[in-house]
Each structure stands twice: as structure tokens, then as C-alpha cells.
Swiss-Prot record:
The lineage of its organism: Eukaryota, Viridiplantae, Streptophyta, Embryophyta, Tracheophyta. Pfam families: Dirigent. The keyword Signal applies. Dirigent proteins impart stereoselectivity on the phenoxy radical-coupling reaction, yielding optically active lignans from two molecules of coniferyl alcohol in the biosynthesis of lignans, flavonolignans, and alkaloids and thus plays a central role in plant secondary metabolism. This is Dirigent protein 19. Glycans are attached at residue 125. One of its GO terms (cellular component) is apoplast. It comes from Arabidopsis thaliana (Mouse-ear cress). It comes from the Eukaryota. The gene is DIR19. Residues 1-16 form the signal peptide.
């Protein structure tokens, strides 16, 4: 009886996995064959406000004492940064960058960026893109991959190019231009 039950459970799970993979492939194939892939480019300005009463970036982990050097290794900040059309914070806000960044290099200032750009205005209102990658902040232009999206950016892939527009050494506040290049359906 025990061996029959084991056989039945293993067979059922195997069959379920096969059906899920076949069904999933069929649905994805049908969806992709009916839609034309397009390239979208847009530019936003990312405002990392770390000081003041209305900060959009908060420290959730400070570096361990043995890594208190200038690289920020071990630092982690949670963000809900405004995305605007121009470098001025008072310009039209079109979305928010929500996620975190963390200091991941002991040798230089290198960050792991994990964030969603939630679009709140215009044609792409309600859509998101997900950025996950390394940001070498002292490079003039940094490239990070877009690994997915939702809404009108479903099945998105592509990259963003980040360029620091302004960085205040005293406050730590930054304005970064993001050029987003997306392939999506």
C-alpha cells in the first residue's frame, strides 16, 4: 500500500509539472506570436533625497565598523524616489523609483541597484520596469539591465543608462538622469 501511494504521488507531481510546462509554453507562444515587439525610449530624472523631513531614501543598514571607509561597503538604503521629466524636483513627476541600493564593493564605490520604476502618468500609467544591476557611481555613464516589467511593459527587457546630473557632497542628495531603452510587446 505504501509503495503504491508513493508511486501515485510521484506520478501525479511529474504529470502536473509536464502539464504546467507545456501549457505555459503554449500560452506564452500564442501571446508572443500575436503581438509585435517594439522599442521604447524615455528619459526620467531620479531624485535621491537623503536629507530633510521629506527624504525619499532611508538607511536600513549601516556598514559594519570594520568597513567604515569611503566606499560604503555594507550600506543599504531603501528608496521611494521621485522620477521627474526634468532635473528640477518641482517639474512634473511621472513616476517613482522604489526598491533599494547597497554598497557592494570594498575597493570603490559600487552599488547593487534593485528597483522598480513605477510609471504614474501618461500612456504608461500603471506600468513598471525592473532594474537590477551594478552601478559604478563614478563612471560618467553606467549601464544596468532591465530584467522585466508589467502593464504595457510586460515581457520587457533592455537597459538603462544612468548619468549623474548633480551630487551634493554635503547632503548626499543626488539627481541622476536615466535613459531607458526597452523592448516589449
Amino acid at each position: 500500500m505504501g509503495s503504491f501511494l508513493s508511486f501515485f504521488l510521484i506520478s501525479s507531481r511529474t504529470l502536473a509539472l509536464v502539464l504546467i510546462s507545456v501549457t505555459g509554453e503554449t500560452l506564452e507562444s500564442n501571446f508572443l506570436h500575436h503581438k509585435k515587439e517594439k522599442l521604447t525610449h524615455f528619459r526620467v530624472y531620479w531624485h535621491d533625497i537623503v536629507t530633510g523631513q521629506d527624504s525619499s531614501s532611508v538607511s536600513i543598514m549601516n556598514p559594519p565598523k570594520k568597513y567604515t571607509g569611503a566606499t560604503g561597503f555594507g550600506l543599504m538604503r531603501m528608496i521611494d524616489n521621485p522620477l521627474t521629466l526634468t532635473p528640477k524636483l518641482s517639474s512634473k513627476m511621472v513616476g517613482r523609483a522604489q526598491g533599494f541600493y547597497a554598497g557592494t564593493s570594498k575597493e570603490e564605490i559600487g552599488l547593487l541597484m534593485a528597483m522598480n520604476f513605477a510609471i504614474l502618468d501618461g500612456k504608461y500609467n500603471g506600468s513598471t520596469i525592473t532594474v537590477l544591476g551594478r552601478n559604478s557611481v563614478f563612471d560618467k555613464v553606467r549601464e544596468m539591465p532591465v530584467i522585466g516589467g508589467s502593464g504595457l511593459f510586460r515581457f520587457a527587457r533592455g537597459y538603462v543608462q544612468a548619468s549623474t546630473h548633480e551630487f551634493n557632497l554635503k547632503t548626499g542628495n543626488a539627481i541622476v538622469e536615466y535613459n531607458c531603452y526597452l523592448l516589449h510587446y
